From Swiss-Prot:
Subcellular localization: Cell membrane
Signal peptide region: none
One of the Pfam families matching this protein, by short name: TatA_B_E
Source taxon at top rank: Bacteria
GO BP terms in the entry: protein transport by the Tat complex
Statement: the UniProt record of this protein carries the keyword Manganese: no
Compositional bias segments (type: Polar residues): 49-71
Name assigned to this protein: Sec-independent protein translocase protein TatA
Family, similarity comment: Belongs to the TatA/E family.
One GO cellular component term noted in the UniProt record for this chain: TAT protein transport complex
């Protein structure tokens, strides 16, 4: 029980041929193969993208730039007159 004997495979093949017909089987196999090739190429492409992203994240910065902090004076500083706009 549980394993398929050669007779099971023969019956399965006969049922598939009867269901799909002998003319449609080559087309079905061809489209299945084409779909598998597309799927594999997409997987390969995703893996190369992930590897490129991982290598970009792993490379340390060669020459980090030191930035000095600067004081930013807001336009409404206390040195200017404070006027409030009043609605007309």
């Amino acid at each position: 029980m549980g394993s398929l004997s050669p007779w099971h495979w023969v019956v399965l093949v006969v049922v598939v041929v009867l269901l799909f017909g002998a003319k449609k089987l080559p087309d079905a196999a061809r489209s299945l193969g084409k779909s598998m090739r597309i799927f594999k190429s997409e997987l390969r492409e995703m893996q190369t993208e992930n590897q490129a992203q991982a290598s970009a994240l792993e490379t340390p910065m060669q020459n980090p730039t030191v930035v000095q902090s600067q004081r930013v004076v807001p336009p409404w500083s206390t040195e200017q007159d404070h006027t409030e706009a009043r609605p007309a």
